[in-house]
């Protein structure tokens, strides 16, 4: 069986954050996960180990692979279920399995921002490049996925360079500010705490800082990085360990860390609300897995929003850019066809390689026979003639035998094929009896 492309995954279209956080891969787990995925196929009849890459973000977890194993789809879904210890019947309804051109189209759309919650956002392209880099370091990339991702990045660049897909987009960070303004009439009068110091927190800090908040504080596990980010926006840093004791000081809390477990629990928030004498707290949890226990959202004076909640606001700004979407989709469709042509051409490579191997074996055998003839003193001209005759006979033996065995339409097709091979073959009208 030829190598087949396959994408298995879940995203914000197919699964809520409560499930997405359970199938997310922390960065440090991706390389070991790729290793275990490849090991699944060691006992299968397919001769080659699969190529694989894992893309894991707040909005999606996807496994891209290239394999010649017919059972790859079911094996990949079962592996994802087993790896995350989620019952298959619970996970399967939310999983999409995209083969061949569908997988290619999906990769192009994801990198171009067409499949993002924030239409046209650029962060996903960097995340995909990081996923490819990690897979490369893990030794799980090969010819097929390398080619897929290189073309994916080229398509994303083309889409962003020739369409207005990213123009006037409402980012998650901007959506967070809009929601805060619904709770607090003046963000400028509020104290804002950011937990984490990654790219998403940096974007949020940029948007909130533009509102001139009363105070801006960054709490991060790495103190130096948190201090550097806080200084950039005229704020100050706070040790993450101080969070439980000082949470009540802040009106707005935005969290996005790489923690695999919640860092803000129900009890801590209850104490903060009590200390604030029930003044409202606006909380945004942009992390997947979530940083804030979901039960916090049930508290009377807490307004908790997740990435899925912010998505509703983001989608309000997507409708106005449908012309750019149509233009981007047209570009992608053309590039999908181009890639599939390359993929189809790859399927003949083993055949060509086999033909070369056979022809070279024939050549070596006849050259060795000619050397023996020369060694025993045969006439060189006769040896050359015998060599060329033997090579000619053996090289045309296969095509000639195939023609003799063929009947009817198969024979006609073979004749046309042979005429294409041998450009100087006489036409049928030239081969009639004279």
Swiss-Prot record:
Pfam families according to UniProt: GlutR_dimer, GlutR_N, Shikimate_DH
Which residues carry out catalysis?
58 (nucleophile)
Q: In which pathway does it act?
A: Porphyrin-containing compound metabolism; protoporphyrin-IX biosynthesis; 5-aminolevulinate from L-glutamyl-tRNA(Glu): step 1/2
Q: Which GO terms describe its molecular function?
A: glutamyl-tRNA reductase activity; NADP binding
One GO BP annotation of this record:
protoporphyrinogen IX biosynthetic process from glutamate
So what does this thing catalyse? (S)-4-amino-5-oxopentanoate + tRNA(Glu) + NADP(+) = L-glutamyl-tRNA(Glu) + NADPH + H(+)
Record-marked site positions (Important for activity): 106
Task: Identify the domain of life.
Answer: Bacteria
EC number(s) from the headed UniProt entry = 1.2.1.70
* Binding positions for substrate per the UniProt entry: 57-60, 116, 121-123, 127
InterPro entries, per database record: 4pyrrol_synth_GluRdtase, 4pyrrol_synth_GluRdtase_dimer, 4pyrrol_synth_GluRdtase_N, GluRdtase_CS, GluRdtase_dimer_dom_sf, GluRdtase_N_sf, NAD(P)-bd_dom_sf, Shikm_DH/Glu-tRNA_Rdtase
Keywords per UniProt: NADP, Oxidoreductase, Porphyrin biosynthesis
Q: Which residues are NADP(+)-binding?
A: 196-201
What is the documented function of this protein? Catalyzes the NADPH-dependent reduction of glutamyl-tRNA(Glu) to glutamate 1-semialdehyde (GSA).
What is written about domains in the entry's comments? Answer: Possesses an unusual extended V-shaped dimeric structure with each monomer consisting of three distinct domains arranged along a curved 'spinal' alpha-helix. The N-terminal catalytic domain specifically recognizes the glutamate moiety of the substrate. The second domain is the NADPH-binding domain, and the third C-terminal domain is responsible for dimerization.
Task: State any further remark.
Answer: During catalysis, the active site Cys acts as a nucleophile attacking the alpha-carbonyl group of tRNA-bound glutamate with the formation of a thioester intermediate between enzyme and glutamate, and the concomitant release of tRNA(Glu). The thioester intermediate is finally reduced by direct hydride transfer from NADPH, to form the product GSA.
Q: How does it assemble?
A: Homodimer.
- Protein family per UniProt: Belongs to the glutamyl-tRNA reductase family.
Q: What is this protein called?
A: Glutamyl-tRNA reductase
Species of the source = Burkholderia mallei (strain SAVP1)
């Amino acid at each position: 069986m030829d190598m087949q492309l396959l994408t298995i995954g879940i995203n914000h279209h197919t699964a809520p954050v409560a499930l997405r956080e359970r199938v997310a891969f922390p960065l440090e787990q991706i390389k070991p996960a790729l290793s275990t995925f490849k090991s699944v196929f060691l006992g299968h009849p397919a001769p080659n180990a699969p190529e694989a890459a894992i893309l894991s973000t707040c909005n999606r977890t996807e496994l891209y692979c290239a394999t010649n194993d017919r059972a790859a789809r079911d094996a990949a879904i079962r592996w994802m279920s087993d790896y995350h210890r989620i019952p298959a019947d619970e996970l399967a309804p939310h999983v999409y399995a995209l083969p061949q051109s569908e997988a290619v189209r999906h990769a192009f759309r994801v990198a171009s921002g067409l499949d993002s919650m924030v239409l046209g956002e650029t962060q996903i392209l960097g995340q995909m490049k990081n996923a490819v880099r990690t897979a490369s370091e893990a030794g799980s990339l090969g010819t097929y996925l390398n080619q897929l991702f290189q073309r994916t990045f080229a398509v994303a660049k083309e889409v962003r360079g020739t369409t207005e897909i990213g123009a006037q987009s409402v980012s998650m960070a901007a959506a967070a500010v809009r929601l805060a303004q619904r709770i607090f009439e003046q963000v400028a009068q509020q104290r804002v705490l950011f937990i984490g110091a990654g790219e998403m927190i940096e974007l949020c800090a940029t948007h909130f800082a533009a509102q001139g908040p009363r105070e801006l504080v960054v709490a991060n596990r790495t103190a130096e990085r948190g201090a550097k980010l806080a200084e950039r926006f005229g704020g100050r840093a706070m040790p993450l360990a101080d969070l439980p004791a000082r949470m009540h000081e802040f009106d707005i809390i935005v969290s996005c860390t790489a923690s695999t477990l919640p860092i803000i629990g129900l009890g801590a928030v209850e104490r903060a609300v009590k200390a604030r004498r029930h003044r409202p707290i606006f909380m945004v949890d942009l992390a997947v897995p979530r940083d804030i226990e979901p039960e916090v959202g049930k508290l009377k004076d807490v307004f908790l929003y997740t990435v899925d909640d912010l998505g509703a606001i983001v989608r309000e700004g997507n409708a106005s850019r449908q012309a750019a979407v149509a233009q981007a989709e047209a570009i992608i469709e053309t590039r999908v066809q181009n890639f599939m042509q390359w993929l189809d051409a790859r399927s003949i490579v083993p055949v060509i390689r086999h033909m070369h191997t056979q022809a070279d074996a024939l050549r070596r055998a006849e050259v060795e026979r000619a050397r023996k003839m020369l060694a025993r003193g045969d006439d060189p001209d006769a040896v050359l003639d015998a060599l060329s005759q033997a090579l000619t006979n053996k090289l045309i033996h296969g095509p000639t035998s195939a023609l003799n065995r063929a009947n009817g339409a198969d024979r006609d097709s073979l004749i046309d094929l042979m005429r294409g091979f041998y450009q100087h073959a006489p036409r049928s009208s030239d081969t009639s009896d004279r």
